[in-house]
Amino acid sequence: MLNLDWFQPYDGVIHSTGVIYAAICNLPRDMRFKRENMLVLGLLPGPNEVSLHQINHYLAPIVNELVLLWDGVTFDNTFEKICGHISALSSCYRCEKKANYENHKYNFAGMDNMSEWFINRNSAQFCENALGWRRCNSNAARNRFVKTTGVRWSELLRLPYFDPIQFLSIDPMHCLFLGIAKWIVKRIWVDENILKPETLKEIQKKMNQFQVPADIGRIPGKVECGEGFANFTADQWRIFFNIYATVSLWKHLPGVDKKILTRFVRICSILVGRIVQSNLMDEAHQKLVEIVKIIEQNYGRDMITLNLHLSLHLYECAKDFGPLYAFWCFSFERMNGMLGKMLTSKNILFLLKLILNSIPLFIF
Ligand SMILES: [Zn+2]
């Protein structure tokens, strides 16, 4: 949303100064007009208000940038990992845990010596290494440096308050629901034939008997489709474990998997709450540790994925950023959906009209 506003900065003399503002409509309505969220795109010095097409001289550089954004901006490969970390698949970016490379893939097994690696990485050391990366003067030198230190430079490190370890939160949506929930059900229970195709039909039948309030969300209806639990979204995994899983899965699971199920359901019910208590967060953390140990002991080291490891950091992220709903990615996913729907000619015209209407000079 753009707006051109004129005001008189001086007393006793007529001198009009203009400002072109932008508000980010992606922000909630109660946030987008806060001072810290408003953008000043241009200043028009005056002393007189510009008229008609003269405004174009001021709009041109702004439009150049908007056009660039509309086309999309590709960052240099260096910034694919925006905070300068190497892929988390080979090394956790919050603690000292390094992935094991076994059977041609990485795993994060090895809970026995947790006290040795469950230690926060050192931010100061990271920043020092990042500066070292900047001093490398060739691609080969930079590659060698990354292999040794696991660190690259990121422009974000120019922010004086930025902590490259603490400020990287784990997204609970990807970690818990698209990561662990999906992994446990599909890769362990379905692939290991604990939940067979005919069992999936029974589970679906049981779920269809549930009568839940309308605002809880759609009942997942694809349990028996495809390879099982087909195309479940993160939200459907959340709903499944919070409402349906215990009743519909209980009689189909052996003892050890019942242990995984009860712990994960409890974890989900604690972590999705709007209010979290530190003692309950502590319980959730302990249960996550137990789940990782149970899976490692019963299904092997290969089954300990990055997400299972990262879930061990959710507790400390919640301490820094608040309840999980306050920093999970569901909100961004909703924006993706909205933006996708806007890409129709009708909506683009609507957006253009909205922008033009917010610039008084364009209303002839
Ligand atoms: Zn870690």
Give the label of every model feature segment.
Residues 5, 62, 83, 92-95, ...:
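Short, conserved catalytic/metal-binding motifs centered on acidic residues
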Residues 25-73, 103, 272:
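Compact, glycine/acidic-enriched structural inserts
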Residues 1-31, 57, 61-64, 231-239, ...:
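Core catalytic machinery and nucleic-acid-binding channels of phosphodiester-processing enzymes
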Residues 1-48, 94-97, 247-249, 269:
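Acidic, metal-ligating active-site segments
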Residues 49, 67-234, 253, 341, ...:
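Domain-level detector for long, ordered catalytic/regulatory cores in large eukaryotic signaling
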Residues 8-12, 29-32, 48-52, 77-78, ...:
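Eukaryotic short linear interaction motifs
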Residues 13-18, 34-36, 53-56, 80-82, ...:
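Short coil/turn segments at secondary-structure boundaries
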Residues 95-98, 186-364:
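Terminal interaction-prone segments of large eukaryotic proteins
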